[in-house]
């Protein structure tokens, strides 16, 4: 019984794999990138490559900026000025920083103007707002989700609904958070976020970029048409997923007898490439920037290359209230929600999407 209990308590994970072609008009690749809003790490691996092109390097170095605002009152995100300045003129993203989704109150502003609040029971009751229990609360409901459509509210700022929400955030239950903010503007107008929040402690940040060349890297052999692989011919998509995790974590893949840290090795069949280029970007990275990277990698094979494939991997913030679109996200024991593209030289691609136990199935 004890063993069975431990198995039940073990965190479950879900990995969804699909294949398509970038030229297919039904391809979902762009939509899935655009609706995974809160990304903290982006990595791409290019086998048989020792240096990045200037165009790709410029894309990598221009994935920012984003902003950190300390002790920002929540009511600042629902003012008419904020809505008209940022939400209506572009895509605005906000996420509470250093809050734990399973323990603390957390907030996220989606680019479509939806404000998502994940509140503990006491805070939820004190705000007086309407919401619903978290889907991951269990029998004893301790977390509630509140969704506020700021675009809808802005249509009638004299409404009782807007007055009630504004009163709740300003007077009834004032809430303050440290926020990460970013704004993707649609026009040529310069960002005014620094000046707009100048009365608060605000800092501008650029994502951190790590570039490295991996020598004599043992890589799985893949066939774009075979997600499940073919014995002695090509590896499975799941095997590649595990291998990428090891590469990104800088795990030694030699599987030598005296290696007591890891016995993992590259799946077979495999091939050794003389060099591979690994780039990792860390920060508050917008989907719009990831779309540009993906588009550029799609055109990587426009000219003949030795590499048969490249990968683009994206990890979301573990404590964001949502994963894809408005899908509620929970932490439990991992909080992972991530996706990976394997881009082949014939424009086929594999898309792998992974979530933890407290998540819906990826879209």
UniProtKB/Swiss-Prot annotation:
One of its GO terms (molecular function) is ribonuclease P activity. Its main location: nucleus. Coiled coil: none annotated. It comes from the Eukaryota. Component of nuclear RNase P and RNase MRP ribonucleoproteins. RNase P consists of a catalytic RNA moiety and about 10 protein subunits; POP1, POP4, POP5, POP7, RPP14, RPP21, RPP25, RPP30, RPP38 and RPP40. Within the RNase P complex, POP1, POP7 and RPP25 form the 'finger' subcomplex, POP5, RPP14, RPP40 and homodimeric RPP30 form the 'palm' subcomplex, and RPP21, POP4 and RPP38 form the 'wrist' subcomplex. All subunits of the RNase P complex interact with the catalytic RNA. Several subunits of RNase P are also part of the RNase MRP complex. PANTHER family: RIBONUCLEASE P PROTEIN SUBUNIT P40. This is Ribonuclease P protein subunit p40. It is found in: Nucleus, Nucleolus. Component of ribonuclease P, a ribonucleoprotein complex that generates mature tRNA molecules by cleaving their 5'-ends. Also a component of the MRP ribonuclease complex, which cleaves pre-rRNA sequences. Keywords: Nucleus, RNA-binding, rRNA processing, tRNA processing. GO terms for biological process: endonucleolytic cleavage in ITS1 to separate SSU-rRNA from 5.8S rRNA and LSU-rRNA from tricistronic rRNA transcript (SSU-rRNA, 5.8S rRNA, LSU-rRNA); tRNA 5'-leader removal.
């Amino acid at each position: 019984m004890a063993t069975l209990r431990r198995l039940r308590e073990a965190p479950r994970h879900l990995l969804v794999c699909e294949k398509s072609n970038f030229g297919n008009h039904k391809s979902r690749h762009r939509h899935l990138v655009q609706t995974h809003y809160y990304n903290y790490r982006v990595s791409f691996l290019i086998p048989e490559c020792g240096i990045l092109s200037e165009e790709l390097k410029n894309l990598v170095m221009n994935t920012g900026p984003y902003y950190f605002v300390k002790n920002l009152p929540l009511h600042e995100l629902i003012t008419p000025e904020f809505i008209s300045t940022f939400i209506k003129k572009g895509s605005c993203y906000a996420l509470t920083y250093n809050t734990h989704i399973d323990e603390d109150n957390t907030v996220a502003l989606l680019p479509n103007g939806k404000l998502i609040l994940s509140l503990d029971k006491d805070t939820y009751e004190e705000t007086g707002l309407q919401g619903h229990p978290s889907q991951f609360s269990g029998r004893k409901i301790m977390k509630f989700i509140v969704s506020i459509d700021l675009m809808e509210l802005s249509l009638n700022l004299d409404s009782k609904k807007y007055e009630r929400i504004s009163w709740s955030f300003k007077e009834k239950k004032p809430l303050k958070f440290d926020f990460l903010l970013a704004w993707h503007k649609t026009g040529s107008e310069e960002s005014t976020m620094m000046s707009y929040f100048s009365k608060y402690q605000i800092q501008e940040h650029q994502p951190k970029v790590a570039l490295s060349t991996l020598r004599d890297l043992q890589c799985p052999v893949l066939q774009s048409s075979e997600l499940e692989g073919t014995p002695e011919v090509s590896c499975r998509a799941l095997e590649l997923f595990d291998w990428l995790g090891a590469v990104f974590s800088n795990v030694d893949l030699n599987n030598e007898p005296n290696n007591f840290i890891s016995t993992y090795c590259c799946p077979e069949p495999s091939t050794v490439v003389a060099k591979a280029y690994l780039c990792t970007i860390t920060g508050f990275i917008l989907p719009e920037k990831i779309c540009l990277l993906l588009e550029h990698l799609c055109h990587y094979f426009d000219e003949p290359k030795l590499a048969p494939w490249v990968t683009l991997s994206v990890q979301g913030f573990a404590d964001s209230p949502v994963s894809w679109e408005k899908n509620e996200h929970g932490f439990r024991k991992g909080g992972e929600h991530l996706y990976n593209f394997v881009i082949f030289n014939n424009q086929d691609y594999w898309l792998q999407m992974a979530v933890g136990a407290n998540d819906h199935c990826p879209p």
